[in-house]
Amino acid sequence: MLVTRRFRQSAMEENMKILKIDLSKHEINEEEFNQKDYGFFGGRGLIARFLTDYCDPTCDPLGPDNPLIFATGYFSGTILTTSNRLSIGAKSPLTGGIKESNSGGNVARWMTDQGIKLIMFTGQSEDWVYLYIDPDGKPALLDASQYVGMTTYPIGTALREQYGDKIAVAAIGIAGEHLGLVSSVMCSEFNTGIPCRGAARGGLGAVMGSKHLKAVVIDKAAAPYKVPMTPEQAAEFKELNKKIVAAVTGNPLTGQTMPLYGSAAGVDTTGKMGALPYKNFSGEFTPDWERIGTTQWRKNLIDHGGKSTIPCQPGCIVRCSNEYCDQHGNYLSAGIEYETVALCGSNLGIFDTDAICTLDRLCDDYGMDTIDIGTALGVMMDQGVMEFGDAEAAINTVRTMFDADSKWGPILKNGCAAVADALGVPKQEIQRVPVSKRQAFAAYDPRVIRGYGLSWERGPMGADHTAGSAATYIPNLTPEQQADYTLAVTATCDCFMCLFAWSAVNYNPEARPAICRMAGILAGMPEGPDMSMIDQNGRAILQLEYAFNEKAGITHDQDMFYGGRKNYMYQVPAAATKAPFRSIQDGPLPTPPKPPVPPTPPKKEEEKK
């Protein structure tokens, strides 16, 4: 029997609420959420805190004891740009450790407008259900049997037909139903409703599928919750926000490049420096990167009738999302990111943007991580299963994954590490697998950008594609300190705002103190805090995550890539650096020799003599 509980109206109340949903009993309970109990934690920080409190780290990640958590950011519901991101977390069935994955879209803002800070699902439903929250904030678990077997595009359409266009949806596709270890939770994009914003990493779609939870549907609030501020606080917050807007719009990347090209603009940078993955992270320079670089990407996007400069979430001034049509003008996919262009493109020797976006659409529709699927296909090509550059074979392999007679589908749904295992790579002397802690690399060669590699080795979530915000060398830090600083910056970012906007703010001398003070206003502090307190927020999150992992059996002794010393990153030099990756286990980089001191030029008087 499905249960509906009635709750108080949350709009205009000072404290938000937590929904605790027991799927085994079909019970929904509400608790008050007081931000003062959680410091500056939002999003990822709340995930770490609640998993620490409610999850046994040794539990089966696909069992009833693994909570699935939806949490909003610290600034969600305010005027701060890009602050309406959604964090989803659980123990990862892919890595076996703690996992937070975040997404744009409208789900987090709709949660906030309903006065909901966090939703925690526990247990497992016997029957397929979905959560619906109506305009008055009343939640209900409803029968989802009619949606089982649907991919994310059709279920989004069906739900909008039932509830109207103003809903926010987070749903799994058939990859999540099949408990694929790289399955994603796909969220609706702001304005368009397209399910192209994915909390894609770590297999959280499988956790959702294991609970027989097909979707979370949130209607637009009839009386939206207002973040409590006095008139004086609101005026100060608004004035400080002008500095944030100036930093983001004045930054060449977030203010000019990304609105036109999206994050795919990264291809130009990594292509030129030799960090763009090519043929399964071979380490070679990518010879044809311009074919998927910003100029050609933009030309194809516009010539085919696509769109750019789209905000993926309410209040975003970066507007880096896009819609791509094929060469015949038919809608193909949306929200195409740098990681997808690189890993489903140059990494496979594919330089056809239509083919790349077809792979993106298939992954979004099935509900899968394009990073892990792209790297898995790269390993398959490297091992001779198909040829590099064979776009048709790659597309067909993904398209038929869930057919009953698919050879590779049951393996590919579990990601790059599973494919490598099946191909016998662990028996090879050099193991060409771009994976850390069972999670695939993001689209940066760590031999060229070592900061990313250090973060991926040491990070609690493995090769997290949002780690590496401080990707360059920082003097006087050990590799462990470099990695931890980078990860702490990332953890704070995942609590506050989008990574791109955060990067513009974090390195701006006027915006940094402004966002600190904005955090203080929400905390009710008469002044401050300073940036050291904000950085400590990120470190506190890391401590919780590392502690969880240690109890789950994941320790720093395992801080190496797939195969340990046999991984090709440690063996094969990159063309750009002429050196392999130096592991965090190897200690700091050698101190470069000091250049010789040039002789002191003679004085003019001595020259005359």
Question: Which positions does each model-derived feature cover?
Answer:
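Protein-protein interaction/assembly regions in multi-subunit complexes
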Residues: 11-205, 210-222, 231-251, 262-286, ...
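Extended C-terminal regions of large enzymes
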Residues: 7, 11, 160-170, 174-609
